Amino acid sequence: GENAAGGFGITPSICEEFFEAGVNVVTTGNHVWDQREIISHIDSEPRLLRPHNYPDGTPGSGAHLFTMASGYRVAVVNIMLRLFMEPLDDPFRCVDRFIQGHSLCKTADAIVVDAHGEASSEKQALGYMLDGRVTAVVGSHTHVPTADTRILPNGTGFQTDAGMCGDYDSVIGGDKGS
């Protein structure tokens, strides 16, 4: 969702369009603050996540427990990696502490981690660190889906990058003629 506003962030109205279309959760990353009006909206919208490893006091939340219509409870954790990205709190320690200690994870039927980052190696390292502790680790940020979807040795689903929701007749969602 972080590139929904013409490639730069997301607005409250776009966010609401997603939810009206049936989207359960919108994760973000390094473009989360590109549209200033999202700052006042993100605190009141638990379905819109910003990376969990932003410093304490940052508006919004990086994780939430969602209850599906079936009653199935899914914890979603949005984390931003650091290689070639802006320097945030250590994503590995942050997600490790969260998985170990947060009550949200103890009541979830599934835990899904969105690993927003540039480097495939960093996403893979996080996947292996969390293998057997979460249901899935799915990377985001590069706009290009990877063909490496698999189950890791201890049962965690993994994909280096899910790609983008956008126009494939484009350059990572932007005008190919620009």
Describe the role of every protein-language-model region:
Residues 1-178:
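Acidic, metal/ion-coordinating pockets
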